[in-house]
């Protein structure tokens, strides 16, 4: 079964972070980006700018109030939560073994990691060979690239 990777940017207030995540996701060939719990500038300016980019490229942007809404509505086979300090598995150039179906990859849009309650039930992952938090866009670039190139075509 092929893997469909869908990035999720959760709990974000930065306009630039939303736009950068959209550019990154779409440039990797992904069709869908999900933004959950956007507030402040991200909600007022970042989401509209990312929507403009999505429409221009023929891609999708899904904006939802909570992470659980994305999980409930998109019915993923797996949820990966990017958590540098509590990772159970590491994602490297070979991707991540055992993934199939629809995979949501959740990146924290703010400085704190995902709250343990938000990551409940998810596979907690981080980047092989990287020590410490490098920020959500760098994390997304590496993890999404490894997942897409390491284990078949994961374009969503």
Swiss-Prot record:
GO terms for biological process: DNA restriction-modification system. The keyword Ligase does not apply. It comes from the Archaea. It is an enzyme of class 3 (hydrolase). One of its GO terms (molecular function) is DNA binding. Its EC number is 3.1.21.4. It catalyses: Endonucleolytic cleavage of DNA to give specific double-stranded fragments with terminal 5'-phosphates. Transmembrane segments: none annotated. It holds the Pfam family DUF2122. Keywords: DNA-binding, Endonuclease, Hydrolase, Nuclease, Restriction system. The keyword Hydrolase applies. A putative type II restriction enzyme, its methylase would be APE_2002. To M.jannaschii MJ1199. This is Putative type II restriction enzyme ApeKORF2002P. It comes from Aeropyrum pernix (strain ATCC 700893 / DSM 11879 / JCM 9820 / NBRC 100138 / K1).
